[in-house]
Each structure stands twice: as structure tokens, then as C-alpha cells.
Amino acid sequence: MLADIWPSDQSIQEAVSSSIGPEMFRDRYSDILEEPKWDSIPSEPSPLFPWDEDSSYVRLPTFLEGILLNPVPIDPINSARALLKLGDSVTTDHISPAGAFPKDGPAGKYLIEKGVNIRDFNSFGSRRGNHEVMMRGTFANVRIRNQLAPGTEGGFTTFLPTGEVTSIYDASRKYIADGTDLIVLAGSQYGTGSSRDWAAKGTLLLGVKAVIATSFERIHRSKLIGMGVLPLQFTDGENKQTLRLDGSEIVSIKGLDTVSYTHLRAHETAC
């Protein structure tokens, strides 16, 4: 029987104590900083990371600017327009794809303008350190279907003030230039899939103030909160269809001055 040969916890602990000691780790890591290949990498002696404005891989993201020790009050959302109207089961990969991207999309055009050869585009996953690339890829998965731009595939929407069908990124820039708040309308199980930070970061950088859905995946909901995007849920029995929302509405969300970040953390929903 296995129980006859299986060692006791005491025997295992005695074996570990007699064979493993702190000197093993001290010896192994004593010269960890003495690596010629690592030392040969050019660097500047500084306690802060020297951001390179010419880098196409690592850039200082705008959401790190102006961070305060204490959270600021939640801004009101007035006269917002919908950037997307989505169905059920929108995954984090729909929101922030990790694969390759085309040369004629917003991300590809950005890199070409920066002098990057098409063969060196790599993927969204490899360029997660560049917010300029990642926000241009948000909601750009070819499998996403935005009901505000019927008949299109991928990252397109209708710029509602003019009716122009354009990329989600370009539309977001126009809304931001006009000072228009943005929301996303969604169905159930919004944000399922892998835990992907950029699904929340990219949403914020597009100017989205709130995502209004039937239900949220718990982890993605918490990441939206962490980035300052409000995850708002329809009341039980209500959704886009029952309220007859077609996405063209102008939306104002009242009472946000009474909401604190503790309220947002206290209520968790699962799909």
C-alpha cells in the first residue's frame, strides 16, 4: 500500500532541513548582478526609467499622468453618446486583441507613420508597452460586431452626429475633440475570458466613461473600476432590448456625486 511507503510530514521536514540551507541561495545569487551581457546593455544611471519618445514598444502611458494619492471625485456623465452597442458574451479578446494587426488599421497606420516597417509590426501582445498602439487596437478584433455600424466587421462605429461610419479609434478622437462623454452599451457576460489589463486600459483611453451591461465578468469589472471606468448594470429584468435602446440616445447619468470607490468595490457580480 502507498501508505506503507509514504513518508510522514516529520520525515519530509527533517530531510529538507538537513539538505537545504540559506547558504545555497546566498551562493547562487551572490554574483547575480555580474552578467556581462546584461551589463553591456546601454543605460542611464537614474532612479527613474528614461522614457524614450522614439520607442515604438515602450512609451509613458497617459493614464499615469496626474495621479494623486487620494482618488478624485467621480465626474458627472452628461450628454454622452454610445461608442459601441454590443451583444452578449463580449470577451476581453474582443475588446483588446493580442494577435497581429493590419497595415490599414489605426494601429498599423500609426506604426507606419513612425517609420516601422510592416514586417516589423509584430503583434498587439508584443506591443503592450505602447499605449498608442494598444488604444488603437481596442475593440478592433475582426470578430467583434458593433450594432451601431451594421454590416461591418471589426473596429468600426458610426459617428452619431454626422452618421459617418469610421474606425472606433477615429470616432473616439472626434468625440473627445468635441468634449463629448462616451459610453458602451453591452449585453450579458461582458468581459469574459482571460484577465487582460488592456481591455480596461484601452477602454479608458478611448474616452469611455461608463460601460452599461446586463452583467459583467467579475475580474474585468474590477479592472474597469481600477481604471476609473464605471461598470453600470441594468436592473433585474431590464436590458437594452426591454428599454428599446438603439444606441442613438444621448445619455446623462445622475447621482454620481454620491458614489464612492468603496461602493464600487462592495458589489460584485458574476456572469
Residue positions per predicted region:
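A glycine-rich phosphate-binding loop feature that marks nucleotide/adenosyl-phosphate handling sites
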Residues: 1-6, 30-38, 134
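Mobile "lid/hinge" segments at catalytic clefts and subdomain interfaces of large enzymes
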Residues: 1-26
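Acidic, glycine-rich active-site loops and adjacent beta-strand->loop/helix elements
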Residues: 188-191, 216-220, 237-238
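Active-site-proximal mixed secondary-structure blocks
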Residues: 232-259
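Conserved small/polar residues in nucleotide/adenosyl-binding loops
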Residues: 262-269
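Short hydrophobic alpha-helical runs that function as membrane-insertion/retention elements
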Residues: 209-214, 231-234
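Active-site-proximal loop->helix
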Residues: 218-231
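Non-catalytic terminal/interface segments that mediate subunit docking, oligomerization
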Residues: 42-212
